[in-house]
From Swiss-Prot:
ATP binds at residues 230-236. Pathway: Purine metabolism; GMP biosynthesis; GMP from XMP (L-Gln route): step 1/1. Catalyzes the synthesis of GMP from XMP. Keywords: ATP-binding, Glutamine amidotransferase, GMP biosynthesis, Ligase, Nucleotide-binding, Purine biosynthesis. Homodimer. The keyword Ligase applies. It comes from Burkholderia lata (strain ATCC 17760 / DSM 23089 / LMG 22485 / NCIMB 9086 / R18194 / 383). It catalyses: XMP + L-glutamine + ATP + H2O = GMP + L-glutamate + AMP + diphosphate + 2 H(+). This is GMP synthase [glutamine-hydrolyzing]. The active site is at 81 (nucleophile), 176, 178. Coiled coil: none annotated. SUPFAM superfamilies: Adenine nucleotide alpha hydrolases-like, Class I glutamine amidotransferase-like, GMP synthetase C-terminal dimerisation domain.
Amino acid sequence: MHDKILILDFGSQVTQLIARRVREAHVYCEIHPNDVSDDFVREFAPKAVILSGSHASTYEDHQLRAPQAVWDLGVPVLGICYGMQTMAVQLGGKVEWSDHREFGYAEMRAHGHTRLLDGIEDFKTDEGHGMLKVWMSHGDKVAELPPGFALMASTPSCPIAGMADEARGYYAVQFHPEVTHTLKGRQIIERFVLQIAGAKPDWIMKNHIEEAVAKIREQVGDEEVILGLSGGVDSSVAAALIHRAIGDQLTCVFVDHGLLRLNEGKMVLDMFEGRLHAKVVHVDASEQFLGHLAGVTDPEAKRKIIGREFVEVFQAEAQKLSKAKWLAQGTIYPDVVESGGTKTKKATTIKSHHNVGGLPETLGLKLLEPLRDLFKDEVRELGVALGLPPEMVYRHPFPGPGLGVRILGEVKREFADLLRRADAIFIEELRNTTATAHDAAAGLCGEADVGKSWYDLTSQAFAVFLPVKSVGVMGDGRTYDYVTSLRAVQTTDFMTAHWAHLPYALLGRASNRIINEVRGINRVVYDISGKPPATIEWE
């Protein structure tokens, strides 16, 4: 059994980041609502508990409290932001509204030599005080320490920015160590779970394969499983893992809706039929999808049509596999958390994969979700450990509706063919161009990024087809052809994103190649919009 950290969620938008930081320390953790029962907390048997932040106020909402069992277990507890405030209130301290609210960067001084912060600092003051650059987001503040607690940190606007009762292993910080803006945040969380809680760092994907395979075999027995294979990371890793466990009991259904990337179908079939020797049913439904999309320009309408048609095609194929008793999905942990499907009595809604909707109920199948405890980065690690090629596992995200939402307006086969080729050229240039010392000196990347490909230095990159024509000149003749926009962003969470400052030479090569190699496009532009105000995808 793995040591476990229990994260109680009070409604913060960044609670998942806490879990990711704990998992990065190779310690297993789960997120659950703050109002779980005392029995649940005891049965979970955590090695430590972390209390998340919240948008709420501790003295206005008296319902948002940690279960009493948290304080009765005798295990270390870390409170973050609101978690610090509810710890203070529940253990006899005082919280009040602050006249000087803090939102953004702050420089915080550590006091005393507590185990949590000792030796962790970003710089020293002239007086020799250790300082940390942290990210604050709070209106309330702890005004009076609970009995047994000592001051651990402060800022000019927040005299009690950290507190600790080291005898009981209780620590609390007003800042957010889980966000990347707090430079030493990962180190702080790692110290809490490894040194203070003493959790074993044995949550490693290579080792997880054996556990997952055993669990799948126990669940499925000798029954058959079907899985909708999209070519995306989640479904591909799920397919590889299930095939490792049950072999020919798995049948993958790969639906080509005519809106895939260049050679994507061949890559998927070569991998799963050729290398893994899995059973794959390949359905070319491009005529059906494109026919229903004819004349449709509204983005949401296009998404609904593509989703509906996928369900129809998949259902028809699934009904041919009469022996199948299970439907496998590539559901991952963020899907479960966001849908309220964590493992408590509140788990009433399990989010279905965007491609299969309510198919488990329609087909009378049981649901198999072997990745539901994993974050995306863990899924990628697992894929590599299973032998999937890195170029498949570390591909940029691709929307479920495919090129259907990267072709503005009406979707036509002609437009999809043009976009496929333009997109492939852009991605090829990103993969083949590495960051240089000159790029780093120009501020386009960090010094540590020199030598990495620009594909790896961007979080998502693609081409967009614009259904407008512009005048151009090629050779001695006038052209009147379509426009494509290139889009590349950098982000840590996809909730916000910066446009990628790519080298001009790279953009120039991509533009020249697209215009010369893709007949029908004569103008290329680069999208320099951030998120917000723009979204990453155009539709």
